[in-house]
C-alpha cells in the first residue's frame, strides 16, 4: 500500500468519527441535562482549549521527531474518552469529558494534514483530492449514522465515535513514520511568525471562517430536531453542506493555481 493511500485510510477514519460527533453528539448532550445555551457554552470553551492544544501536539511531534506515535496515542485517548459521555450528567461532568476529548482530538486532523502536506510537497499526491476523501467519509457517516441513531437512540453516538476513533488508532501503524525535514523551531521562533503580516492575515481569515461556523456546528442538529426533523433527515442536511466542501477540495488545486491562495481562501469563506 502506497504512503498516500495509507494516510488517506487513517484520515478517513478520523473524519468519519467527526461525522458522528459533530452531527449526533449534540443530540445526546441534550439528553444529559443540558440546555441549548449550555451546549453552546461547552463547545465554545472546548474550542478555546483547542487553540492551545493543537500547537502543543505539534510541538510534541516536533520534539519527538515522529508524527505516527503521537497520532496513535491521541486517537486511542480520544476513543476512550468518547465513552465518557455515557455516564456524564450535567454541565460540569459533560464539560470535563468534552474538554479532555477535545484536547486529545485536537491532534488528529492537523497531524494527518502534516503527513499529507509533506507528501504533496514531494509531488506524491494532490492534497485537495486526497483531503476530499476525508470530507466524503464525514458525509457517509453523517448520512449512515441517522438510521443507526434513530434505531438505537442518541446514546449510540458516543459509542460509534469510540469505535471509529479506535479503528483510527488501530490503523495508525500503517502511517509512514514521518520525521521533521529540519531542526524543530524554538518556541520563540514560532511566536516570531506573528511578526509576519501575511501570517497574521491568514490567521485572521481562518478565525473568522471558523467562528462563523460555531453556532452551526453546536446547535444546528438540536434546532432541526426541535423543528420535528428525524435523525436521518438531519444527517442529510449536514451532508448537503459537505458535498459542497468536497467539490471545493476536488478543484482546490486548479483553482488555487488560477486564483492564488488569497482569493481561494476568500471563496472558501463565501
Give the label of every model feature segment:
Residues 69-83, 162, 263-270:
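Structural signature of the two symmetry-related core transmembrane helices
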Residues 1-2, 172-208:
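Juxtamembrane intracellular "pre-TM" segments in multi-pass secondary transporters
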Residues 1-47, 199-237:
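Helix-loop boundary and gating motifs at the non-cytosolic
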Residues 156-173:
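Symmetry-related core transmembrane helices of the 12-TM Major Facilitator Superfamily/SLC fold
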Residues 97-133:
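Cytoplasmic helix-loop-helix junction between adjacent transmembrane helices
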Amino acid at each position: 500500500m502506497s504512503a498516500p493511500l495509507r494516510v488517506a485510510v487513517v484520515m478517513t477514519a478520523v473524519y468519519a468519527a467527526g461525522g458522528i460527533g459533530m452531527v449526533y453528539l449534540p443530540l445526546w448532550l441534550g439528553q444529559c441535562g443540558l440546555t441549548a445555551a449550555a451546549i453552546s457554552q461547552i463547545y465554545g470553551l472546548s474550542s478555546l482549549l483547542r487553540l492551545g492544544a493543537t500547537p502543543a501536539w505539534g510541538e510534541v511531534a516536533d520534539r519527538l521527531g515522529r508524527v505516527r506515535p503521537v497520532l496513535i496515542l491521541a486517537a486511542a485517548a480520544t476513543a476512550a474518552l468518547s465513552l465518557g459521555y455515557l455516564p456524564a450528567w450535567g454541565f460540569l461532568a459533560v464539560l470535563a469529558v468534552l474538554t479532555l476529548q477535545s484536547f486529545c482530538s485536537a491532534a488528529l486532523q492537523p497531524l494527518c494534514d502534516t503527513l499529507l502536506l509533506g507528501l504533496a510537497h514531494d509531488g506524491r499526491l494532490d492534497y485537495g483530492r486526497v483531503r476530499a476523501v476525508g470530507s466524503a467519509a464525514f458525509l457517509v457517516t453523517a448520512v449512515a449514522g441517522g438510521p443507526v441513531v434513530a434505531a438505537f437512540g442518541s446514546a449510540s453516538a458516543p459509542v460509534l465515535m469510540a469505535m471509529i476513533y479506535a479503528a483510527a488508532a488501530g490503523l495508525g501503524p500503517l502511517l509512514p513514520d514521518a520525521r521533521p525535514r529540519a531542526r524543530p523551531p524554538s518556541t520563540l521562533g514560532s511566536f516570531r511568525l506573528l511578526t509576519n503580516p501575511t501570517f497574521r492575515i491568514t490567521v485572521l481569515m481562518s478565525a473568522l471562517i471558523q467562528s462563523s461556523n460555531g453556532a452551526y456546528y453546536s446547535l444546528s442538529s438540536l434546532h432541526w430536531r426541535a423543528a420535528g426533523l428525524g435523525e436521518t433527515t438531519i444527517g442529510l442536511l449536514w451532508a448537503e453542506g459537505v458535498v459542497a466542501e468536497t467539490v471545493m477540495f476536488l478543484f482546490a488545486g486548479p483553482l488555487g493555481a488560477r486564483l492564488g491562495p488569497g482569493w481561494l481562501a476568500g471563496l472558501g469563506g463565501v
